[in-house]
């Protein structure tokens, strides 16, 4: 079921699967059901995710908003180029302390995220899905096409997904890959 509400610029996909409906988390507020049960349970990571960077006040403010109620919440981090979105994303990953997938669409971003994660969260093992590699770790960086091709086997691995260049999500391959991953928290990053 695809819906579009022109007044709110609202676009979503709701699909039916056996005894339940799959609804994007950004659509919960539009539903008129009495109760929504999100009974997914994800283990905390055992990795030592210590962020060594120092955020600027505006970056810290953004991170604090994602953790307003003590746990990470889904949302979009939108900021201009050069603002430090990747750097800030590293702190969000570190603070959340759950298995995380960072989704990117190019090999260049794939390498950049791996390098930044290694700098800002030293000692953490970083998994790679893409560029001929398939290795799931506490933090994994994946290229959309590779994640799309392995979406069935990856669907239950991650509690949080950070989507770099989130404005690409409406494309069918990107939205299929993202929606097939059963993460509790999805954070988009976009300029």
Predicted regions and their residues:
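Conserved two-lobed SF2 helicase motor
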Residues: 128, 136-151
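Hydrophobic positions in the central parallel beta-sheet of the AAA+
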Residues: 77, 102, 140-142, 161
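Conserved pre-motif I regulatory segment
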Residues: 35-78
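Walker A/P-loop
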Residues: 69-96
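SF2 helicase catalytic motif II
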Residues: 144-191
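Interdomain "pre-motor" coupling segment immediately N-terminal to P-loop NTPase/helicase cores
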Residues: 1-41
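Conserved helix-turn-beta segment of the N-terminal RecA-like "Helicase ATP-binding" lobe
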Residues: 2, 100, 107-133
């Amino acid at each position: 079921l695809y819906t579009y509400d022109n007044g709110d610029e609202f676009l979503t996909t709701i699909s039916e699967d056996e005894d339940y409906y799959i609804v994007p988390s950004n659509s919960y507020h539009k539903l008129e059901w009495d109760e929504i049960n999100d009974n997914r349970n994800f283990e905390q990571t055992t990795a030592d995710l210590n962020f060594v960077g120092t955020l600027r006040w505006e970056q810290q403010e953004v991170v604090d908003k994602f953790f307003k109620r003590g746990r990470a919440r889904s949302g979009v981090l939108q900021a201009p180029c050069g603002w430090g979105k990747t750097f800030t994303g590293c702190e969000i990953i570190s603070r959340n302390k759950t298995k995380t997938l960072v989704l990117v669409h190019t090999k260049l971003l794939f390498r950049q995220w791996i390098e930044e994660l290694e700098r800002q969260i030293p000692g953490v093992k970083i998994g790679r899905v893409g560029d001929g590699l398939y290795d799931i770790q506490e933090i994994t960086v994946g290229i959309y096409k590779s994640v799309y091709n392995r979406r069935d086997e990856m669907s239950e691995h991650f509690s949080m997904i950070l989507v770099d260049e989130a404005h690409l999500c409406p494309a069918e391959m990107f939205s299929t890959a993202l929606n097939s991953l059963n993460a509790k928290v999805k954070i988009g990053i976009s300029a």
